[in-house]
Amino acid sequence: MACKTLTCSASPLVSNGVVSATSRTNNKKTTTAPFSVCFPYSKCSVRKPASRLVAQATGDNKDTSVDVHVSNNNQGGNNQGSAVERRPRRMALDVSPFGLLDPMSPMRTMRQMMDTMDRLFEDTMTFPGSRNRGTGEIRAPWDIKDDENEIKMRFDMPGLSKEEVKVSVEDDVLVIKGEHKKEESGKDDSWGRNYSSYDTRLSLPDNVDKDKVKAELKNGVLLISIPKTKVEKKVTDVEIK
């Protein structure tokens, strides 16, 4: 077991009625001196497992499907989809390890998408209601599930209606925009205004059908479904000489 040394200083105790800090017995002046204290410590640390909840849309709501606009513009210029570069931080995700090792696999793109969304939504103050009041746990306001036939995305947007959300596909970039404005008036002629907005841009993999993207908003939860296309692998035998 190792020890750490803590260096600190101690001063004489002064009480009421004491005129000076000089000892009456030996007439010597008391001074402050440093001393050392050793505390044993262990290098072992305990990490608490992170809890993860998934939001589900339940009940009836007037919000239905959200229109998805697709636009292609490959004539000159680069793609205007912007990437956000901040510290990487990932949450739990079921990803095949082969997809992470294969540089040509679409799962590599999906991993980048999740990292981007995690950085975009790491500020939980953007939209309220990200904490479970019953357990006090904080859940991610987004989720992605990669199936064999489609990619499913979930975004929590409490307080936003269908008219305040826009989903579009620009070339190979999925664009999600939301804007919410609300004015409140109180007593004594006081009033306030709430405003929240965001613009998310995600690069889509090559093995998806960008013309058949579907979006639906229910109970403040945006659900996006992107069907996959079948990619035939071309195999060519190489003669060994």
From Swiss-Prot:
Keyword vocabulary terms for this entry: Chloroplast, Plastid, Stress response, Transit peptide
Localization (cell): Plastid, Chloroplast
Any Pfam family hit: HSP20
Record-annotated sHSP domain positions: 133-241
Gene Ontology BP annotations: response to heat
Transit peptide in keyword set: yes
InterPro entries per the UniProt record, alphabetical: A-crystallin/Hsp20_dom, HSP20-like_chaperone, HSP21-like
Keyword presence, Glycoprotein: no
UniProt lineage: Eukaryota, Viridiplantae, Streptophyta, Embryophyta, Tracheophyta
Protein known as: Small heat shock protein, chloroplastic
Example of a GO cellular component annotation carried by this entry: chloroplast
Protein family membership: Belongs to the small heat shock protein (HSP20) family.
Organism, as annotated: Petunia hybrida (Petunia)
